[in-house]
Amino acid sequence: MTIDNDLSRIAEQEKALSFDAFDLTTAWQLGKLLQELASERGLGIAIDVTLHSMPVFYAALPGVTPDNVNWVRRKRNMVLRYFRSSYASGLKLSKDGKTVEDNGLDGADYAPHGGSFPINVKGTGCIGAVTVSGLPQRDDHNLVVEALALMLAKDLDTLRLSPL
């Protein structure tokens, strides 16, 4: 897979994984689904669902460290800044040979790494972010996509990024 292929697939994900409506209950359901998937697989991840800059769901599973908490914050900041997945932002920066600092951002506050995904509502746009941290960045991204696909009854096989 090339960066261009991944960026194209992520754009498809961001379009397909949009909600008709999204509220506090939906946010909780999404967070709980991620927690269940991670627990079943023995994954030590931090999970955050933020809606309108308000934390709605947070869980830290066994194995999470304070570093993961900071990664969640920094990845979420990328989504809330650019309204696209943190992984797509990182891939685009890599493709262009740039850093977040080149865009006037502080790397201590913005992490262009996989694991945060915009919560998009059709006709409205980005209203928040769902973020995980604890796995390699591509796996973090794919886990979030899997949970969104399950919630929205979308075919994961057509959306998931292929393994490297």
UniProtKB/Swiss-Prot annotation:
Transmembrane segments: none annotated. It comes from the Bacteria. InterPro entries: PduO/GlcC-like (IPR005624), PduO/GlcC-like_sf (IPR038084), YBR137W-like (IPR010371). Pfam families: HbpS-like. Belongs to the UPF0303 family. NCBIfam families: PRK02487.1-5. This is UPF0303 protein RHE_CH02903.
